[in-house]
Amino acid sequence: MLDVEGLHLKRGSSEVLSDIRLQLRPGQILGVLGPNGAGKSSLLGALCGELSPSAGQVRLDGRDLHAWPGQERARRLAVLPQASSLGFAFSVEEVVGLGRLPHASGRQRDREIVEAALAAADAGHLASRSYLALSGGERQRVHLARVLAQLWPGEAGTTLLLDEPTSALDPLHQHTTLQAVRSFADRGAAVLVILHDLNLAARYCDHILLLEHGRSHALDTPQRVLTPAALNAVFGIDVLVQPHPERGHPLIITR
């Protein structure tokens, strides 16, 4: 579980996040939405410890985030940044296996977990391929498998932070990726995912944080956050919102 209280973050003299309060709960996905420059990636940087808040606190399982020793924190918290680069000709299996470095579970168990994580990310058929030979979308799925392997199987007490994990993916793999994330949360992990697609967020997230100029415009269920008034205020778009005819979650249609 990750708790954020009164978080403020500065970059130089500019405050990019102001008074952010949220809780990542076991078994749930929190989606973060907002226009470019709203502070989404800065928020993820503060939550993973890459950026230090100017005020407020981030606690992982009741303990200040920076008080956790590196490997111990890595066994509980995994991060998929917006861009992951790797310049070595590792096989896909080796790249995903990097997620197991904080653990001492043995080679056989690690191999089993790597195989399971690749399957969850719909990347099992890529296992023996060179990472450098993959397309951008394939690389994105491999890095998803890596962070899933780091926390596998996704039990309570683990937290997964994802920055636009569907940005390079075709429509099918956007859904298979978020289905894998949904399954991970259903097994007990707490998940935060930054998205740009409003309808994907409405379908897969339990709660949504809507950011505007570094502040929380709304934090609630998709039904309460994804309203025409809120989306017009934050994104400047005119939309129709109606229940999905089969699933019931909000369906957003641009007018």
UniProtKB/Swiss-Prot annotation:
Subcellular location: Cell inner membrane
UniProt membrane topology term: Peripheral membrane protein
One cellular component (GO) term of this entry: plasma membrane
Assigned keywords, A-Z: ATP-binding, Cell inner membrane, Cell membrane, Membrane, Nucleotide-binding, Translocase, Transport
Enzyme class: translocase
GO molecular function, one term: ATP hydrolysis activity
Pfam families: ABC_tran
Binding-site list for ATP: G34, P35, N36, G37, A38, G39, K40, S41
InterPro entries found in the cross-reference section: AAA+_ATPase, ABC_transporter-like_ATP-bd, P-loop_NTPase
Subunit structure as annotated in this protein's UniProt entry: The complex is composed of two ATP-binding proteins (HmuV), two transmembrane proteins (HmuU) and a solute-binding protein (HmuT).
Family, as annotated: Belongs to the ABC transporter superfamily. Heme (hemin) importer (TC 3.A.1.14.5) family.
Name of this protein: Hemin import ATP-binding protein HmuV
Record organism: Pseudomonas entomophila (strain L48)
Gene name, Swiss-Prot/TrEMBL: hmuV
